[in-house]
């Protein structure tokens, strides 16, 4: 663990990417404090206005300040994505570790269940759940969580099995070291770095999935500002007001690219072949 931390802190490119990602997230979490106007207040006579002093990025089809909606939408999108990734990584990792430690028939049954679920595209499962329980950001978030934790369970289970059969774990058992101490001293420090890599790379995927569902009208509902739903609202005004598509699409693109780059760089640093 100390070796990995040292390699991370010595990698200037990773530190730069990490700083930029943190600044992006923090900015949009607090950006609504600087919104020039209400994101939901309708002014029909100001519909689809170009940029001006009152509306720095123009207005949407209902005369709402588009900059304010972008800022509030960023907070909504990022908070939901962070919540999803934190939940599925913790829940999936916990379940995977417990399954690996349990062993026996229960482990085999559980892993076969994961294999069956993983064989079905997650987008299909999410769409089925949303069609059953209805549209809405809460339903969509729960649906994504319900199918996404399985990946983390599978990864953590495989990692624990690998370490469980390693020589130093067997020697620790022979030396009288308890299972709980082995778990916290040897297993978890080797599992969590890999989970962090997956979670970092998964952030962009979940943001894109959440935005895609909102674009289809299955996620955020009016008047809630959210980047994916803003794309859905703006697509019919692509010729008249292209900014309604450009700005939210660009922000989604930037966040996905930045977190993917961060995750790829972190994976290179923590690659066991290099340690």
Regions of interest found by a model, annotated:
Residues 27-62, 216-224:
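Hydrophobic alpha-helical transmembrane segments of membrane transport/permease proteins
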Residues 146-147, 193-203, 242-275:
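C-terminal transmembrane helix and the adjacent membrane-cytosol boundary/short C-terminal tail
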Residues 85, 93, 97, 135-185, ...:
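Membrane-cytosol interface at the C-terminal ends of specific transmembrane alpha-helices
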Residues 66-101:
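Transmembrane alpha-helix signature in integral membrane proteins
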Residues 56, 60, 92, 100-106, ...:
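Generic hydrophobic transmembrane alpha-helix motif, especially the helices
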Residues 59-64, 101-102, 171-190, 231:
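Short helix-to-coil transition segments within interhelical loops
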Residues 1-37, 113, 191:
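N-terminal signal-anchor/first transmembrane alpha helix
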Residues 130-132, 144, 160, 208-251:
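Glycine-rich helix-loop "coupling/hinge" segments at transmembrane-helix boundaries
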């Amino acid at each position: 663990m100390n070796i990995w931390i040292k390699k991370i802190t010595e990698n200037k490119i990773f530190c730069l990417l990490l700083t930029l990602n943190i600044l992006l997230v923090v900015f949009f979490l607090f950006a609504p404090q600087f919104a020039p106007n209400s994101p939901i207040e309708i002014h029909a006579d100001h519909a689809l206005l170009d940029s001006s002093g009152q509306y720095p990025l123009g207005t949407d089809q209902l005369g709402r300040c588009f900059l304010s909606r972008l800022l509030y939408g960023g907070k909504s999108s990022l908070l939901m994505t962070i919540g999803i990734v934190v939940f599925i990584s913790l829940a999936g990792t916990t379940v995977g570790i417990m399954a690996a430690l349990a062993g026996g028939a229960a482990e085999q049954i559980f892993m076969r269940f994961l294999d069956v679920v993983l064989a079905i595209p997650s987008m299909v499962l999410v769409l089925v759940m949303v069609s059953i329980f209805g549209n809405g950001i809460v339903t969509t978030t729960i649906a994504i969580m319900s199918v996404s934790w399985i990946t983390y369970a599978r990864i953590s289970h495989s990692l624990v099995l690998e370490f469980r059969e390693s020589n130093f774990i067997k020697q620790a058992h022979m030396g009288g070291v308890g299972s709980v101490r082995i778990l916290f001293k040897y297993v978890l420090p080797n599992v969590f770095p890999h989970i962090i890599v997956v979670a970092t790379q998964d952030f962009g995927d979940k943001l894109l999935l959440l935005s895609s569902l909102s674009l289809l009208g299955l996620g955020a509902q009016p008047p809630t500002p959210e980047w994916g739903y803003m794309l859905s609202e703006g697509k019919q005004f692509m010729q008249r007001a292209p900014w309604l598509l450009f700005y939210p699409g660009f922000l989604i693109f930037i966040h996905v690219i930045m977190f993917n780059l961060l995750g790829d760089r972190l994976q290179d640093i923590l690659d066991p072949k290099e340690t």
